[in-house]
A protein has these predicted regions:
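Sigma70-family region 2
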Residues: 5, 43-60, 79-81
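Structural recognition of an alpha-helix C-terminal capping motif at a helix-to-coil junction
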Residues: 39-46, 59-71
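Helix-turn-helix DNA-binding module
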Residues: 4, 113, 117, 129-149, ...
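C-terminal edge and immediately downstream basic/flexible tail or linker adjoining helix-turn-helix-like DNA-binding
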Residues: 2-3, 11, 138, 156-178
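Arg/Lys-rich amphipathic alpha helix in sigma70-family domain 2
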Residues: 53-56, 67-88, 100-101
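Acidic, proline/glycine-rich intrinsically disordered inter-domain spacer in sigma factors
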Residues: 2-3, 10, 14, 80, ...
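A short pre-motif secondary-structure segment
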Residues: 122-126
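A short, charge-rich alpha-helical start-of-domain segment used by transcription regulators
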Residues: 1-25, 35-38
C-alpha cells in the first residue's frame, strides 16, 4: 500500500476535527446508545480514512460518512449478538418503580428505539437531522418513495403505541445526553 500524502492526512484530520461532533449526534440518534455511538463513529471514521484518497469530491465527505454510519448501524442491528445487553439487575428480580413517571421525551425515545433499523434511520435523518427526503434517500441508498414509506410506517407505529393523548415534547437543542 502506498504511503498517504500529507495533504490527504491533513484534510482528513481537519474534517474529523470540524465535523465529528455532528457525526456523533447522528450516530447516537441512529444507534441509541452513547458508548455504541462512539464505537459506531470510530468505525465509520476508520472506513472514511481508508477511502479518503479515493474520494473524488472531499466536499461530499460528510454525506459519505453519514451514509457509512447509517449502513454500519443497520448491519450491526442485524447481528444476533447486538441485542444481548449486560444488566445490573436480573430480570426476575427487577421491579419497576410505580412512582417513577416517564417523561414525554423518554416515551418518544423509547418508541423510536423500538423501530426497525431502516425505519429508525429514516426518521432520524428526516426529523432529527432535518434532511430532505432526497438527501435521506441518497444516504440510505434507496428511492425517495422508499424513504416516504419507511417514515410513514414508522410514524404510524409510534402514534399507535403512544396513543392519541400523547403530546410530544417541545423541540430541544440538547437531544444528545450522555
Amino acid at each position: 500500500m502506498a504511503a498517504r500524502r500529507q495533504s490527504d492526512v491533513s484534510a482528513y484530520a481537519e474534517f474529523v476535527a470540524a465535523r465529528s461532533a455532528s457525526m456523533f449526534r447522528t450516530a447516537y440518534l441512529v444507534i441509541g446508545d452513547y458508548q455504541l455511538a462512539e464505537d459506531l463513529l470510530q468505525e465509520s471514521l476508520v472506513k472514511v480514512y481508508v477511502a479518503w484518497p479515493r474520494l473524488q469530491d472531499v466536499a461530499k465527505a460528510e454525506a459519505y460518512t453519514r451514509r457509512i454510519i447509517v449502513t454500519t448501524a443497520i448491519s450491526w442491528r442485524r447481528r444476533r449478538s447486538f441485542h444481548e445487553r449486560a444488566t445490573d439487575e436480573l430480570p426476575e428480580t427487577a421491579v419497576p418503580d410505580p412512582t417513577e413517571r416517564v417523561t414525554g421525551r423518554d416515551k418518544l425515545w423509547s418508541e423510536l428505539h423500538r423501530l426497525p433499523p431502516r425505519q429508525r434511520a429514516a426518521v432520524v435523518l428526516r426529523f432529527c437531522e432535518d434532511m430532505s427526503e432526497a438527501q435521506t434517500a441518497d444516504l440510505m441508498d434507496c428511492s425517495v418513495g422508499t424513504v416516504k414509506r419507511q417514515v410513514s410506517i414508522a410514524l404510524g407505529k409510534m402514534r399507535e403505541r403512544l396513543g392519541a393523548d400523547f403530546v410530544p415534547p417541545a423541540p430541544d437543542a440538547s437531544v444528545v445526553t450522555p
